[in-house]
Structure formats: structure tokens, C-alpha cells
């Protein structure tokens, strides 16, 4: 019959500390999850139809210079993407 040796499991107070630290870790994780869920719950919500209407209104009222096929050609004086011309005669590099 084989001989079984007893295992040294260590100091019982150390085992208790490890279990306590694991419990503290679980509690902290649950608390953080609870806080995130509370923040989600407090976030303002609007119906999808209202959000879609708001986006459509914005797109119809805001001129997009990158889509000239919809808004027509952009006058040079209004083009924000046109390189700015310097008023001086010299450029220092």
C-alpha cells in the first residue's frame, strides 16, 4: 500500500488573510460595477425618432463644404479648406 505524506498547507492565519483579500477584491469589483451601472441609469435617454430628427435637422441646416454635389460649389471667400495666402512678400523656412 502506498504511503501518503501530509501536505504542509502553511500558516492558518496567512490562509485567512488571503481569503479576506480575495473577498475584498470581489467586493471592490462589485462596487465598481454597481457604480458604472448607476451612471448608465442616470444618463439622459431620448427616443430614437427624436435623435434621428435632430440629426436630419442638423444635416439640412449645416453646410458641408466637403460635399459640393449637394451644396454646390464653394465660394473662395467661404472655403475653410483653401490654403491661406500670406499678406507678406517673404516666407521664412
Curated annotation (Swiss-Prot):
Belongs to the G protein gamma family. Residues 1-22 are annotated as: Disordered. It comes from Neurospora crassa (strain ATCC 24698 / 74-OR23-1A / CBS 708.71 / DSM 1257 / FGSC 987). It is found in: Membrane. InterPro entries: G-protein_gamma-like_dom, GGL_sf, Ste18_fungal. It comes from the Eukaryota. Pfam families: G-gamma. This is Guanine nucleotide-binding protein subunit gamma. GO terms for molecular function: G-protein beta-subunit binding. One of its GO terms (cellular component) is heterotrimeric G-protein complex. The gene is gng-1.
